[in-house]
Amino acid sequence: LPSQFLENWCWEEDALNFISGHYETGEPLPADLLERMLAARDYQSAMQMVRQLEFSLFDFLLHSEKGSTVDVQGVLDSVRDEVAVSVPPSFNRFQNGFGHIFAGGYAAGYYSYKWAEVLSADAYSKFEEDGIFNRETGKAFLSNILEMGGSKPPMELFVAFRGREPKVDALLRHSGIKG
């Protein structure tokens, strides 16, 4: 949560003006450039989200198969048939290099990337509601999330900060997905 959460301030004009400036003049980032950056951030974000969900579902199903032999390509094909917007050509073997789920310590855990985005966006939405530099909200995040680390179950920490369980709404909004 913290690493993705902190990225949110890099998309806020007030935060960018506070932490950055032109290397020679000190002038802030021009507003029109920030607007173009914000527009580009959401470009095909729904496609990227579906792709991440495809990877997560593939990972779950692959690691839920019992027995010594798994038809990896068959599992991937069935996932793609169900969720892919654009199915790669049959010669594509991306799974052979998908190290996250085989050698990266994320076996049956690839979904955690998307879950971290849900938590990050929802936690940040509290700052959007209260003001991105709100001292009390910052202290609450510090004491309920950062200082606690892994000392309590993550959901308990999130609820202590946000006052409720996570919702996906903020991630969809931050991704430019309306619906």
Regions found by a protein language model. Give the residues of each.
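Cation-handling catalytic/transport regions enriched in His/Asp/Glu
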Residues: L1-G179
